[in-house]
C-alpha cells in the first residue's frame, strides 16, 4: 500500500509562501534557491512551486549555511558533493554486501 501524501517525504505539498513562513525567509530567497537549482521543487498545474518535506530540510541547511556567510553557489556545490558522497557510500555498502556473500564463512 502506498503511503499517503502526508507521510510521503517526496510528496510536493507546500507552496512557496508556506515554506517561507515555516523557515522565516523571504519568498524571493526561495525563488533564488530554485533558480540556482539548489533544490528544484515540482510545479503545480498552474505553475506554482510545490516543496516536499525533504526539500524543506535541504532549504533549512541552505539557510543555516547562508547565515554563516556562504554564498548560494557555494552552498549548491556543497549539497551536490554531499549527495555524491551519499551515493558512493551506498554503492560501496552494496559492493561490500555482495562481496561478503561471495566469500566463504570464516572457520
Q: What is each of the regions a protein language model found here?
A:
Residues 1-64:
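Basic helix-turn-helix/winged-helix DNA-binding cores
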Amino acid at each position: 500500500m502506498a503511503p499517503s501524501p502526508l507521510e510521503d517525504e517526496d510528496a510536493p505539498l507546500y507552496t512557496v509562501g508556506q515554506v517561507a513562513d515555516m523557515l522565516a525567509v523571504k519568498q524571493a530567497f526561495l525563488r533564488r534557491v530554485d533558480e540556482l537549482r539548489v533544490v528544484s521543487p515540482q510545479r503545480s498545474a498552474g505553475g506554482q512551486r510545490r516543496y516536499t518535506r525533504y526539500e524543506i530540510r535541504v532549504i533549512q541547511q541552505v539557510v543555516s549555511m547562508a547565515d554563516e556567510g556562504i554564498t548560494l553557489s557555494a552552498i549548491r556545490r556543497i549539497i551536490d558533493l554531499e549527495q555524491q558522497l551519499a551515493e558512493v557510500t551506498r554503492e560501496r555498502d552494496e559492493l561490500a554486501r555482495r562481496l561478503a556473500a561471495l566469500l566463504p564463512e570464516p572457520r
